[in-house]
């Protein structure tokens, strides 16, 4: 008869649960954590209560993300009391902030592992250390190491995958914490990127999204230099790959070469996420964005000229310090002029350690909220109009699975990133099909397979 081992025994195979907050980079980091743990013999669970290891992968771009982490850690105290052998780990950008790891350990002493963004690859070692020595680990690496290649990765999707092409950011926008928690820009070699994509294709993947904090800066740190436009062309030539997307682009670095590459490369989807943040040149200067309203609109004009059917999306911050009614009106007018297919709108959130946190002319909360509501109304109106233009058209859709709202329907996305729910054959999941769009909704399209 086999002996039942204590869950803290090093040889025990257990279950793990990961909760992720934040951007696509964080999502991919969680896929790597999952890959490493599965390699160790762990099984993933979607139920916190069943887990032997719980990992929170955190975000600190906005205060709301941090508050969610605090709230969820508070809930875990009860689980830890019921199961003292439960191992709780917190990682990600929030932990990389100066003094945050110590704050978490003080507030939540039951947390076993606290690490940042630069030593994620060592997580299995830290886990084994906790299990073996019945101790806790708090290790925040201040500086980024060289890029770790070939990490195990457990991807959530079997047909679409994220491929990180670079890490970090050198831009230092005055509102943003990212350069402080993700480090300076480091690019992967094109050979390593191509190798990862080829492996994914061999496993049946159809669509790749190239990730970076600012993909347009790709390759500046490589010897010899490789531009993002050159990388796009190389990726486009990979046999068997069907679709390529990328994010995020910084307007100051979106060159004519990149726009031309998107227009000419047949696998590159006609979708560009181009964060504007504000329509006011005055505010953009205070944000340290390195472009003004005119320059941004010039880039948009070039994009629309070369890629007429492009879907543009953006990020907008409402209530940045010093934003006047005139500044906000300029944001509204820019949104109307560009006509974004979608926009991610945010209330300005003070991030400790950033220059903007010290700006004295903070906008009152009630003013921020009123402006936010006005902006969302305009954005949604334009999105609905853009979606309406798809009615009657036939679109190529990569079928991702059954619809979340109706199990009798399938769902997938067009090349321009539009979500389509449609009646079709379930055997089509994982394949490309043509769908006739019969109805436009506020945030999605409805159609039927033809």
From Swiss-Prot:
Give the Radical SAM core domain ranges: 155-385
Report the EC code(s) recorded for this entry. Answer: 2.8.4.3
Q: Any note on cofactor binding?
A: Binds 2 [4Fe-4S] clusters. One cluster is coordinated with 3 cysteines and an exchangeable S-adenosyl-L-methionine.
Kindly name one Pfam family recorded for this protein.
TRAM
Q: Enumerate the Gene3D superfamilies for this protein.
A: Methylthiotransferase, N-terminal domain, tm_1862 like domain
Write out the residues that bind [4Fe-4S] cluster 2: 169, 173, 176
Assembly and interaction partners: Monomer.
Q: Which NCBIfam families match?
A: miaB-methiolase (TIGR01574), MiaB/RimO family radical SAM methylthiotransferase (TIGR00089)
Name of protein: tRNA-2-methylthio-N(6)-dimethylallyladenosine synthase
Q: Write down the species.
A: Clostridium botulinum (strain Langeland / NCTC 10281 / Type F)
């Amino acid at each position: 008869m086999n002996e039942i081992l204590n869950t803290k025994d090093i040889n025990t195979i257990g279950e793990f649960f990961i909760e992720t907050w934040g951007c696509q980079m964080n999502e991919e980091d969680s896929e790597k954590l999952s890959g490493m743990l599965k390699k160790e013999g762990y099984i993933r669970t979607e139920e916190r209560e069943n887990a032997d290891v719980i990992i929170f992968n955190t975000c600190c771009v906005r205060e709301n993300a941090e508050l969610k982490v605090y709230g969820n850690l508070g809930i875990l105290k009860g689980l830890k009391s019921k199961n003292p052998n439960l191992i709780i780990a917190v990682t990600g950008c929030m932990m990389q902030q100066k003094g945050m790891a110590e704050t978490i350990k003080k507030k939540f002493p039951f947390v076993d592992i606290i690490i940042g963004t630069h030593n994620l690859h060592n997580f299995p070692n830290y886990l084994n250390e906790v299990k073996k020595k019945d101790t806790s680990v708090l290790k925040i690496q201040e500086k980024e190491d060289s890029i770790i290649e070939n990490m195990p990765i457990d991807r959530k999707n079997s047909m679409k995958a994220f491929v990180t092409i670079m890490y970090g950011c050198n831009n230092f926008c005055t509102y943003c914490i990212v350069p402080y928690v993700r480090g300076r820009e480091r690019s992967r070699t094109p050979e390593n990127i191509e190798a990862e994509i080829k492996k994914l294709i061999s496993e049946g993947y159809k669509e790749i999204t190239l990730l970076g904090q600012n993909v347009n800066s790709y390759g500046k740190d490589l010897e010899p230099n490789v531009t993002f436009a050159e990388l796009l062309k190389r990726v486009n030539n990979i046999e068997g790959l069907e679709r390529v997307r990328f994010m995020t682009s910084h307007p100051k670095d979106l060159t004519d070469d990149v726009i031309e590459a998107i227009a000419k490369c047949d696998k590159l989807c006609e979708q560009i996420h181009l964060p504007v943040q504000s329509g006011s040149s005055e505010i953009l200067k205070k944000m340290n964005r390195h472009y003004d309203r005119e320059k941004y609109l010039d880039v948009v004009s070039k994009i629309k000229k070369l890629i007429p059917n492009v879907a543009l999306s953006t990020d907008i911050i409402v209530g940045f310090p010093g934003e006047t009614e005139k500044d906000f009106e300029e944001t509204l007018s820019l949104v109307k002029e560009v006509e974004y297919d979608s926009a991610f709108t945010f209330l300005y959130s003070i991030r400790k350690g950033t220059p903007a946190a010290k700006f004295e002319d903070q906008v009152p909360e009630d003013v921020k909220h009123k402006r936010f509501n006005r902006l969302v109304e305009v954005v949604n109106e334009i999105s609905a109009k853009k979606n309406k233009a798809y009615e009657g058209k036939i679109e190529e859709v990569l079928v991702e699975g059954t619809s979340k709202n109706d199990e009798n329907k399938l769902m997938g996305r067009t090349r321009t990133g539009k979500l389509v729910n449609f009646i079709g054959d379930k055997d089509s999941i994982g394949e490309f099909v043509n769908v006739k769009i019969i109805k436009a909704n506020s945030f999605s399209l409805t159609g039927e397979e033809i």
